[in-house]
From Swiss-Prot:
It comes from Saccharomyces cerevisiae (strain ATCC 204508 / S288c). Plays a role in the coordination of growth and proliferation. Required for entry into G0 phase under conditions of carbon limitation. Involved in the general stress response; acts together with PSR1 to activate stress response element (STRE)-mediated gene expression, possibly through dephosphorylation of MSN2. Residues 1-12, 347-358 have a biased composition (Polar residues). Belongs to the WHI2 family. Transmembrane segments: none annotated. It comes from the Eukaryota. GO terms for biological process: actin filament organization; cellular hyperosmotic response; cellular response to amino acid starvation; cellular response to heat; cellular response to oxidative stress; endocytosis; mitophagy; negative regulation of TORC1 signaling. Residues 20-31, 227-250 have a biased composition (Low complexity). This is Growth regulation protein. One of its GO terms (cellular component) is cell periphery. Interacts with MSN2 and PSR1.
Length: 486
């Protein structure tokens, strides 16, 4: 079976570890004062949208996102010069990253940080926090002294907020399926007309692809899958329409395995991209989805726990109001006092009667001592029984109230190890474009492009529908980000 996804080789990522060298250089001036270093603000200018973020916030983002923010691995100013010594007054300039995508990232990570610190998981368990959840520092829990060597990696997915980072980089190439004729013999003008036509086609194709927001729709467009399906049709011969439909929706084993892993971790087959943007002036579409792993740190799990706890308390409240008070112990004590008094009186009488029957007196004395011991045992058992009946029932353990989340352990393969999967696909579509010309012979797919002659060129634009074949290359990057663990 094919690999699910190909791990990114460190040799192919020139700036992995991103910003590490620059961080080490600047760390020297903050020695002895780590909190000032981590809390120092960084001014980001993303397409003239200004954001202020702490160093810990920035460095807690996963590597796949840092590479998108800083492709060269360094901070750049407005002029494109490297900022070697970053200060509070410096402005880090980011050109090719959409501001709404950055806001989407910060929204998800801020919520995860809030759950980590304001709703600690250890309060659900009978374990001390020091042994259950390691202490973390900073906005996203970045701490140089933090270590997970003592924690089981499986438990990390239950103890810490985790985010599945899925990114798609899509490149598309447009191939018109028609021929062109020109009314002018000037080759330079004809090239301008053709360039304008292709620009309109690329813009329309970009809008079409951007509107396709379904995440898993791209998996079905692989050329390899289409070739396998065509081969199956040839081998089976003529198929019914129902068989054709079921075959067209079948994924390969690698794609199906990847889809099942994501769907078992919070995604659904209908999940859409959280952010999908086309780069200005390029046939490139970047998509991002941040899926919070459905573990014990989520708000949904807390709601289930609180509902189950309230239901359990409501069911056991009547029995708590009818607990038996320890009356039997008082009765036993009174019986014990009476027994002691009677034994004292009997002993005095026997002493006055003399020693006429010493054997009989000893037997009676043993009998009285046996009764006294029985009374003591009865008193002890009665008190224990009363205390047992008066003790309220204890709240069940966490997983007795709420089922333990079923988390796919294979996600740990992508923790701190971003992985990629690349495939090609093609699609034949029809696009509506505005061009300087019209169909000369639509049956033969011939378009005539005409050079505009009016003062207002836009008046000579005509809307036509043209067939286009799209060649699409998709690159998926998958990474697991765990909040609060360095």
């Amino acid at each position: 079976m094919d690999d699910i996804i190909t791990q990114v080789s460190p040799d192919n990522a020139e700036s992995a570890p991103i910003l590490q060298e620059q961080q080490q250089q600047q760390n020297s001036q903050y020695e002895g004062n780590e909190e000032d270093y981590g809390d120092s603000l960084i001014h980001l200018n993303i397409q003239e949208n200004h954001y202020f973020i702490t160093r810990d916030q920035l460095m807690s983002l996963p590597e796949s996102l840092l590479l998108c923010l800083f492709p060269s691995g360094v901070f750049l100013d407005r002029c494109g010069q490297v900022i070697t010594n970053l200060t509070r007054d410096d402005e880090v300039y980011i050109v090719n990253f959409p501001p709404d995508c950055f806001e989407y990232i910060m929204e998800i990570y801020t919520k995860a940080h809030d759950d980590l610190y304001n709703h600690p998981v250890e309060k659900f368990f009978d374990r001390p926090s020091s042994s259950f959840v390691s202490n973390a520092k900073g906005f996203f829990g970045l701490s140089s002294n933090n270590s997970i060597s003592s924690n089981n990696e499986q438990d990390i997915l239950h103890q810490k907020p985790a985010i599945i980072v899925l990114r798609e980089d899509l490149d598309y190439y447009c191939v018109p399926q028609e021929e062109f004729q020109f009314d002018s013999t000037n080759e330079e003008n004809n090239e301008d007309l053709l360039r304008h036509f292709m620009a309109q086609v690329k813009m329309a194709a970009g809008s079409y692809l951007t509107s396709k927001t379904s995440i898993f729709q791209g998996l079905y467009s692989s050329n390899r899958l289409k070739q396998q399906q065509q081969q199956q049709k040839i081998e089976k011969g003529s198929n019914s329409s129902s068989n054709t439909k079921s075959t067209s929706k079948k994924l390969g084993p690698a794609e199906q395995h990847l889809m099942d892993m994501l769907c078992s971790s919070g995604f659904t087959k209908e999940t859409c991209w959280g952010n999908r943007t086309q780069e200005t002036g390029k046939t490139v579409i970047s998509s991002l989805s941040l899926c919070r792993l459905a573990n014990e740190t989520t708000e949904g799990f807390r709601q289930k726990f609180n509902e189950a706890k309230a239901k359990w308390e409501a069911e056991h409240k009547p029995s708590q109001d009818n607990f038996i008070t320890p009356m039997q112990s008082n009765i036993s004590i009174n019986s014990l006092s009476a027994s002691k008094s009677n034994s004292t009186i009997s002993t005095a009488r026997n002493l006055t009667s003399g020693s006429t029957a010493p054997a009989t007196a000893r037997d009676k004395r043993k009998s009285r001592l046996s009764k006294l011991a029985d009374n003591v045992r009865s008193h002890s058992s009665s008190r224990h029984s009363s205390q047992t009946r008066s003790k309220p029932p204890e709240l069940p353990k966490l997983y007795d109230l709420v089922p333990k989340p079923n988390i796919n352990a294979k996600l740990l393969l992508f923790w701190r190890k971003p992985a990629r999967k690349c495939w090609w696909g093609e699609e034949d579509i029809e696009l509506e474009v505005e061009v300087f010309g019209s169909w000369k012979d639509e049956s033969k797919k011939i378009i005539e492009l005409i050079l505009p002659t009016n003062v207002d060129p836009e008046a000579e634009l005509h809307k036509i529908i043209v067939p286009v074949r799209l060649h699409i290359r998709r690159v998926w990057t998958l990474e697991l980000s765990v909040i609060g663990v360095q």
